[in-house]
A protein has these predicted regions:
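Extracytoplasmic/secreted envelope proteins and their assembly/folding machinery
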Residues: 70-78, 92-96, 100, 104, ...
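Acidic, polar ligand-binding/catalytic clefts
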Residues: 23-30, 71, 75, 79, ...
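Beta->alpha turn/N-cap motifs
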Residues: 49-54, 88-93, 102-114, 138, ...
């Protein structure tokens, strides 16, 4: 874990010029403008809960304090709403229980948005999603992947994953399967496969990290089908805290409109997963 955090911090130091080609996702409809809600009236700080072991979304910074894309987005939302907020670290599997026990007010962590989650909690619109992507070796002039291309070239995927199911269903591929992503990435680097289909965030961290040694790059676009790859993540509140959830949704929209979202995204995703 420390090695992964170090890699994220090194990536975050990439000069701005190197990040110019990063595609910044937009999860907000510019035509859908809700009436601006009033921030919740409170005399105490809003308590955000997070975990510190999932870079680059949330992790412990060099000073030991929580940081990451989700954490800094939460802080920016608080500033936009004029609210005083704190960020408290909990073990990931205890975050929702801590929220329900009133030990915090909002969860800012990589908890997937699902119907089951919404049955017991409120959540903002997603501010991040996990795209699926194809990676290729950079020294080969391979065509962008499509059904024909994938059927004619060796492609790898992690066995038993949504990515394997998607590849077989929509690309009619017969991929070479691997037990984990690290093994599949090593196979791509060695040239045993020509395409690797997997989680865009994990692949972005690998492509920009030392283990890839500059071997590989993304090819083609992103794949975001909810049924396979989920709805993403948003800020999660208790069911009764509708005013807070609505205010956070409004803050996220404004952070996107004003460019703050893009600034934070480039800071934590210099090699973009999209």
């Amino acid at each position: 874990m420390q090695g992964l955090i170090a890699a994220v911090l090194m990536l975050a130091a990439v000069p701005a010029a190197a990040a110019e080609a990063v595609m910044i996702p937009n999860f907000w409809n510019p035509r859908a403008r809700l009436e601006r809600p009033e921030p919740p009236q409170t005399t105490r700080p809003i308590r955000f809960l997070t975990d510190d072991e999932y870079p680059p979304l949330h992790f412990a910074g060099p000073d030991g304090n929580p940081t990451g894309f989700a954490v800094e987005l939460a802080r920016a939302a608080c500033e936009k709403l004029g609210l005083t907020c704190t960020v408290q670290v909990r073990r990931f599997d205890t975050l929702l229980d801590a929220l329900q026990a009133n030990q915090g007010d909002v969860v800012a962590a990589a908890i997937p948005l699902t119907a089951a989650l919404r049955a017991d909690h409120r959540a903002t619109r997603p501010y991040f999603r996990w795209p699926a992507r194809f990676a290729v070796r950079g020294d080969k002039s391979l065509p962008a992947p499509d059904t024909k291309v994938v059927s004619e070239h060796p492609v790898g995927v992690v066995s038993g994953t949504a990515h394997e199911a998607y590849l077989r269903t929509f690309f009619h591929a017969t991929p070479k399967t691997y037990p984990d992503l690290g093994t599949a990435e090593a196979a791509l680097r060695r040239g045993e496969i020509e395409y690797l289909f997997g989680d865009g965030l994990a692949l972005a961290l690998w492509i920009g990290g030392t283990e890839a040694a500059g071997c590989c790059a993304f090819s083609g676009g992103d794949y975001l089908e909810n049924r396979y790859f989920g709805e993403g993540i948003g800020f999660v509140t208790r069911k009764e805290d509708e005013a807070l959830a609505r205010a956070l949704d409004d803050a996220l929209q404004r952070l996107w409109d004003e460019g703050k979202y893009a600034e934070l995204y480039l800071r934590f995703f210099p090699v973009g997963p999209f």
